[in-house]
Amino acid sequence: MKRKLFLCTLAGSAAGLVFGDPVSDFLASAVREPHPGRVGLAEVGQVRALARMFARQDHGFVGGLSAEAVVTQLSVSANLLDGRFSYEAVRLQLFSAMAELADVAAGMCFDAGAHGQAQQCFQFAVGCATEAGDWAMRAKALSGLANLAVHGGQRDDALSMAEMALVRADRLPPVTRAVMYTRHARALGLNGVHREPDCLAATDQAEQHFAAGTGDEPSWMAYYTCAHLERDIGRALLHLAVNGGDPTKAQARLQAAVTSFPAKPSRGKTLAIANLAHVTMSRDDPAHAAVLGHTALDAMATVRSDRVFAALRQVRVAGQRHSRIAAVAELNQRLDGALPGTVIS
């Protein structure tokens, strides 16, 4: 089976991530329902609709309850994979739809701070997409694993997953390919200033492919705009900036992202503001960083995201050495009250 061959290769490239056959593993732990019988295009459509409903919810108010709901639905829907199919094409479409739902579930778990569950769902998405021959979704789920590894500071795993996402990049449409290069750039940036030339080359590739976009992308990529590209490039450069690299490039990208996002608070915009506050606090202007930090905190009334929390914790750590500045001291105090586990003495 091509899925198992691919996953064996994947397992050998990711030291910290345990890959067996994630489809079989997930099904073994899924909520078991009566045998689904015959599965057709109607069921495939229902799974796609669920994925898109939860994706819309994910772009709104995200939290632990939403993540629990989508994982439960994924577990129940996974039973359809044991059904009977009149045509092989229907079976492959179901695996593709299940990969989309699993990827959404993984992202929501990641954002809720449930990292173990996020990893399991991303791996399930990789397995389903590989079985379906859905190269774009396979790359997206692998890039999710790369982001998860970056978040955990797992440099080797981040780079392995990001590079695996770019295998046969020629099969990916331009904007999807651009996103994969931003994930690769971020993993390279995490690996240190000595990888700066490679990181910058990856960001250049991302810009070139994004500019070549024709609109012929998977529906789940429709959300991705120039603002997201600027933010993702800025986040890749952030790792370099706070470790001795040039901060101005990261600041310019993140500021462009903040300006390009709609005025309404959103997770993407708030994350860009928090990242901009981090690099600014770390390198050159703590007073302005404090203003940015307050702006990000204000947005948390409507944006709940563990990833934003993590970015603000980095602002708090960077702000500790500037605590004699009144504006920074005020921000530090507010961060200590707003973010669990961030009190720093």
Regions found by a protein language model. Name each.
Residues 1-44:
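Compositionally biased, long intrinsically disordered regions
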Residues 34-345:
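Conserved binding/catalytic microenvironments
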